[in-house]
Amino acid sequence: HLDKYNQEIRKMRTDGVDVLPILTKEDAANALNHKAATLLAIEEGGAIDGSLEALRCLYELGLRAMTLTWSNRNDIADGVNEECSGGGLTTFGRKVVQEMNRLGILVDVSHIAPAGFWDVINLSTKPIIATHSCAKGLCPHPRNLDDKQILAINENDGMIGVTYARQFLNQDINKACIDDVYRHIDYMLNLMGNDDHVGFGSDFDGTTLPHDMQGVQSYKEIVEYLQSKNYSDSTIEKLTHKNALNLLQKVL
């Protein structure tokens, strides 16, 4: 099953889809010249089963981003559900971050407990990402990022992908809507003082969406909503793709 990703790429190409698997800085720079681009990522670093060699093998198969933990503890660090233990990166976890930096694999800190987050910030020599997180200042869910974490990612030259998980957008999940997506984006942009480090984070395959979103087809509505809030075309382009592609060019 390890090579399923590359099998799918080959199948798409056989079916006539102009798809680019992003493996290098040059691929990230060229992505907009193709109909579609993909990036192989793993959510939950426990997938490498305590082995740096497994991480290297996955890199050779195309892995270019990995979430260090899910919400529970693994041999890399504690997830947010383990926050009371105060656990940060383990000795092995520190080696994982260093090897990901060396190889050119994007370090994803969504799901990690605060202690581990700060360990990564202090250890990583490359920009990091929180692929699917929102602002704790608007919705105090443990999975969201507080102001200090948001500012740290800004200083790290990294990126936050705002997720559409309704429980992270609004404390009243039944009221979560596209306006909340806008509010979290706007909150982060104002806090950072720039529009270079925030983007769309989605999590379409792993959560329940707000009532006015159906899936990837809802991106048009999000963009139109941002336009209605007088966001410039330049800022919207950064949010939809440019910030992510720029980040990949710094890391891969």
Predicted regions and their residues:
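A metal-dependent hydrolase metal-coordination microenvironment
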Residues: 1-52, 68, 77-85, 89-94, ...
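Histidine/acidic-residue-rich catalytic or RNA/ligand-binding cores of hydrolases
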Residues: 77-78, 118-124, 140-145, 169-185, ...
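Conserved, mostly hydrophobic/aromatic
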Residues: 24, 62, 107, 132, ...
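Structural preference for beta-strand elements that scaffold enzyme active sites
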Residues: 20, 37-41, 64-65, 104-108, ...
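Active-site environment of divalent metal-dependent phosphoester hydrolases
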Residues: 27-29, 47-48, 72-77, 112-118, ...
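Histidine/acidic residue-rich metal-binding segments in metalloenzymes
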Residues: 50-60, 82-129, 142-156, 179-196
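Mid-to-C-terminal alpha-helical segments outside catalytic/metal-binding sites
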Residues: 214-252
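Short acidic/histidine-rich active-site segments
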Residues: 163-164, 192-216
